[in-house]
Swiss-Prot record:
Subcellular location: Mitochondrion
Function of the molecule: May regulate the stability of some mitochondrial mRNA species.
Taxonomic lineage from the root: Eukaryota, Metazoa, Chordata, Craniata, Vertebrata
GO biological process: regulation of mitochondrial mRNA stability
Protein name per Swiss-Prot or TrEMBL: FAST kinase domain-containing protein 1, mitochondrial
Top-level taxon in the UniProt lineage: Eukaryota
């Protein structure tokens, strides 16, 4: 820092000696080495100060502050100094004499000192800038836009005018710094068309970027986050720049980029691993509260247990020095880490109580969600939060805020609502988006469940409110005529309200807007259909048709989302073979560009539909790939880590059973044994009923085995064995008749044979009870994972009987005799 400061001063001295002095006063400013010297000059020469002097003095004061570490800056002292106030008055009096560059520079520098937006100088500079807007060059325009953002004028007519100028001059922009700055400033007032033009322009300029300037692509990614637009080609280019600069990034920059990626649901394993290594490397350098907070936020969710414990210890020692913003960041990270450090949770909760009144509604919502998730044991904090949240809700007129506050209030212990809150919710319902309505539905349902029976008036009000909410939801869905708007609103719905109340209306709208399905929205549309668990052939056929025709326009990583509803819902479209082949051929050349976990998910989804591309399978079951996968999973949350490992096991099992020619070894024995050890061994009342009926059908309870684990660790509800004459065989020797993987061998024809367990000609029968999860919402069609399980059991030599819950609970099977007859026909079928 000292060397830089000396160089800065020396460069000014050298510059001074090179030219013949034409402005002695300016020369005196140039040799100033501190704020005090600047203020002395200003005080002695107020009458002589020109626009140039004023602008230079203000800029110099900011440069002195920039040289200092954040913790040592004295912005408040400078702002309150009498000579700084004099500079502001002089600047305001000389605005008409400023050129465009000086005007914008003075506005920018004066805002560094945290002046209020209503400050007279700031207002006059902004007004003059508005008058000159059309003649600003792009550099001045971008800096002026940054100043407006800092004054919270993102959505102002003035910002809209800047966006219009950018729209007209975009072809002339050749500087990524200027473009990225403008993109971040004007994002809130641009059309989809201008958004696409900005993205295309950024895409072309990133290729020409000096890779050391990582702040420019960071702002581009920030723009994409602000627009909620995951445009992967541009994200990957920006990520490439970040990868080349990770070694130079500090925790703050890494934390920002990681947060942006999370918001965009963009994963890059290489960046996460490099970022984690860099953050661990900088741990010892982060000794102050500000840097350690950023380190904790970035590294905590990706760190192993030892590093986490060290980070938590550091936070405990610094917590008392943290400001409200830092405490909020720490709490959010603790939630993401699934922190169970009760001492740290209690400490942060206690400190938060001092600042609750200073937080904005959205921040209070985050605090409430976090302390509920972390199971905070501080009743005083919950009580204070409830009072503040209720007060804010009653005074708010913004639908999004009311719905958000209602949702978080409903999560508080023993939450109660009064008539004023219900009245407020009732008033804003017609203005709510689908995501707002879903939040309110979640809150109202919770209030109904916790409402005391004696409060009948409130209970009735809640019921009527829920009915009105459902009506508003149906009306809003019916009015939407743009599929992209429809998908955007549905993306942020929470809870079961949509699936339980509005599902048919939603699917009807999908059918109504089906002609608007294009390659641009196919992946998002497919993900939504998967989420609904609703098999609509018309919609799925359209997705398959558009994807097949325009597969080259869809980003290769989006093929997973595009395929998902077909494999999950077990639906084969009319052009099924062409559709699957087009998707497979599209992503195969890019396998090395996929994150490891996505390759596993993609391979598993194809396995559900009986597609096993050899290149994909060999890529997964490769020592180097599995090593990269393990490294990536270490940076994931425990839930996502477990999900990917489960899918890898299921893929390994599917390949071993269905594609023995690939000669992929089975290496999940220990993993499956651990899963089996943790599993809940209880059975449901329906399963208990079926077991008793099987005893009557087969001749005794010892003829049917419950909760059987097969080779390759498929869990089946019941197993029985029939001899070659279809006579039941009792389980006399459990050790002999239980399936044993060591006795399983490949037969000549491919299927697995168990060589020593069964008498000649005997047949194992697997009996499975399929509850509603095994079917789509509107169909008796069995979903993909249950179809795959049946295939595997048949390969293992089982005759598989799948009992559908809707059949078992139907009117036709409402008596014991009917159930017995149903089971007997299925078990002793002719094809057994």
């Amino acid at each position: 820092m000292f060397r830089w400061s000396c160089a800065f001063r020396l460069s000014r001295s050298l510059l001074q000696t090179r030219f013949l002095s034409t402005d002695p006063l300016l020369d005196q400013f140039k040799i100033c080495l501190s704020e005090d010297q600047v203020f002395q000059l200003v005080g002695k020469n107020k009458a002589r100060l020109s626009v140039t002097h004023v602008g230079y003095a203000i800029n110099l004061l900011w440069q002195f502050q920039k040289e200092k570490p954040r913790m040592l800056r004295t912005i408040g002292q400078v702002r309150g100094h009498p000579e700084f106030i004099a500079l502001r008055i002089l600047a305001e009096n000389k605005i008409e004499f400023m050129d465009d560059k000086a005007l914008v520079e003075i506005l920018y520098n004066i805002l560094r000192f945290n002046l209020e937006a209503h400050d007279s100088l700031v207002q006059q500079l902004v007004m003059e800038g508005w008058r000159r807007l059309e003649r600003f060059n792009l550099t001045a325009l971008s800096k002026f836009a940054v100043c407006l953002v800092e004054q919270h004028m993102n959505m102002s007519p003035l910002m809209g005018r800047i966006a219009s100028i950018v729209d007209g001059t975009l072809d002339d922009v050749q500087d990524a710094r200027i473009l990225s700055s403008l993109m971040v400033s004007i994002y809130g007032v641009i059309s989809p068309t201008l958004r696409d033009r900005l993205v295309d322009k950024a895409d072309s300029l990133v290729d020409t970027l000096d890779v050391s300037h990582f702040n420019h692509p960071r702002r581009i990614v920030q723009f994409l986050r602000n627009m909620k637009y995951t445009y992967r080609p541009l994200l990957e280019k920006c990520n490439s720049v970040f990868l080349q600069n990770v070694g130079q990034m500090d925790p703050e920059n890494l934390s920002i980029i990681i947060g942006l990626y999370q918001s965009l649901q963009f994963n890059n394993a290489e960046f996460r691993l490099m970022a984690r290594a860099r953050l661990i490397e900088t741990m010892d350098q982060c000794s102050d509260v500000a840097s350690y907070t950023k380190l904790f936020a970035a590294l905590g969710p990706m760190a192993g247990q030892d590093i986490r414990e060290k980070l938590e210890e550091g936070i405990l020692t610094m917590a008392d020095e943290m400001n409200p913003t830092q405490l909020l960041a720490i709490l959010g990270t603790m939630e993401e880490m699934e922190c169970r450090n009760t001492l740290l949770i209690a400490k942060i909760s206690s400190l938060l109580q001092k600042y609750l009144e200073s937080y904005r509604p959205v921040e209070l919502a985050r605090i409430t969600q976090a302390i509920v998730t972390l199971r905070c044991q501080t009743p005083e904090l919950f009580s204070m939060l409830q009072k503040i949240l209720e007060r804010l809700l009653k005074s708010s007129f913004i639908p999004a805020d009311v719905s958000m506050l209602a949702r978080v209030i409903s999560t508080l212990p023993a939450a109660r609502v009064d008539e004023e809150i219900l009245s407020k919710v009732d008033a804003i319902l017609p203005q709510c988006s689908l995501s707002d309505l879903s939040s309110l539905a979640l809150a109202i349902v919770k209030w109904v469940r916790t409402d005391q029976p004696s409060r009948s008036s409130t209970s009735g009000g809640l019921g009527n409110l829920l009915l009105k909410l459902n009506t508003c939801g149906r009306e809003r869905i019916a009015k939407i005529d743009k599929i992209d708007l429809f998908l955007d609103e549905l993306k942020y719905t929470t809870g079961d309200w949509l699936e339980e109340v509005l599902l048919k209306d939603t699917i009807s709208t999908c059918e109504r807007l089906i002609d608007q399905v294009t390659w641009k929205n196919v992946p998002e549309f497919a993900l939504f259909i998967t989420r609904t668990n609703y098999l609509c052939a018309q919609v799925l056929d359209k997705i398959a048709l558009v994807a097949t025709e325009d597969i080259t326009k869809i980003h290769y990583s989006a093929t997973y989302a595009t395929l998902l509803p077909f494999v999950v819902l077990n639906y084969d479209p009319p052009n099924g073979e062409a559709f699957f082949d087009a998707c497979i051929q599209h992503f195969l050349p890019h396998l090395n560009s996929f994150d490891p976990h996505l390759v596993v998910l993609l391979a598993y989804s194809l396995a559900l539909a009986e597609y096993f591309p050899e290149e994909l399978i060999k890529a997964v079951f490769n020592v180097d790939f599995l090593g990269r996968l393990d490294a990536q999973l270490e940076t994931f949350s425990s839930a996502l880590n477990m999900r990917i490992r489960l899918r890898l096991m299921e893929l390994n099992r599917a390949v071993c059973l269905e594609c023995p020619e690939f000669q992929i070894p089975w290496f999940h024995d220990r993993y499956c044994q651990q899963l089996q050890h943790r599993a809940n061994g209880g059975i449901s009342s329906v399963q208990r009923q079926i077991h008793q009926l099987l005893g009557e059908i087969l001749g005794g309870i010892n003829y049917a085995k419950v909760s059987v684990m097969t080779p390759y660790y498929h869990a089946i509800d019941f197993e029985c064995i029939l001899d070659k004459n279809k006579k039941p065989i009792p389980y006399l020797d459990q050790n002999v008749l239980s399936a044993d993987l060591s006795k399983v061998q490949w037969g000549n024809g491919g299927p697995l044979q168990e060589t020593k367990s069964l008498p000649p000609g005997a047949q194992r029968v697997a009996i499975e009870f399929l509850d509603s999860k095994a079917f789509s919402k509107n169909s008796s069609n069995i979903k993909g994972e249950y179809v795959m399980k049946k295939r595997h059991l048949e390969i293992l030599g089982y005759h598989v009987v799948q009992i559908a819950s809707f059949e078992w609970n139907s009117m036709e099977l409402s008596t014991k005799d009917a159930w017995i007859d149903y089971l007997r026909k299925r078990i002793f079928a002719d094809d057994v």
